Amino acid sequence: MLFRRPGDGLEVLLGHMGGPLWARRDVGAWTVPKGEYTPDEPAWTAARREFQEELGLAPPDGEAVPLGEVRQANGKIVTAWAVEGDLDPAAITPGTFSMEWPPRSGRIARFPEIDRVEWLGLDRAREVIVKAQAAFLDRLAEHSR
């Protein structure tokens, strides 16, 4: 999770999940850049790789603050770190995925994994982030005190 300190607060960079299932959703549709990895890949290495795959930008260098793990409603376990840095959301070139759309149409369409990213203050981020991932925001806030 990329974060910055404008003024006296904290902002985090979150991505809005792409594809037609998320197009009209806001609450619960924002996430830290993330992805799956195999047991033989270190989680930190996977986190950096997924940042690049999802945003199309090199992951920032800097001190990695471990934020631990959360279990999402779908059962997936997400491990996250926070790194202080800055980037222009307009600079992202998101990775894509393919799915049949519309359903049962036989047509395969490509969609961005993340359709946009934004810097959000912690209060706004808590309103829209995937519910389980809100714990990462709390842990970052605690670390930053």
Predicted regions and their residues:
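N-terminal strand-loop-strand
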Residues: 1-31, 81
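Short, charged/polar surface micro-motifs in flexible loops or helix N-caps
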Residues: 6-9, 19-22, 38-39, 74-75, ...
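Residues that scaffold the ATP/ADP-binding catalytic core of kinase and kinase-like folds
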Residues: 24, 40, 128
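The catalytic Nudix box helix
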Residues: 32-67, 121
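Active-site-adjacent beta-strand/loop module that shapes the phosphate/pyrophosphate-binding cleft
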Residues: 69-106, 118, 140
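Alpha-helix-centered segments that form part of catalytic cores
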Residues: 107-123
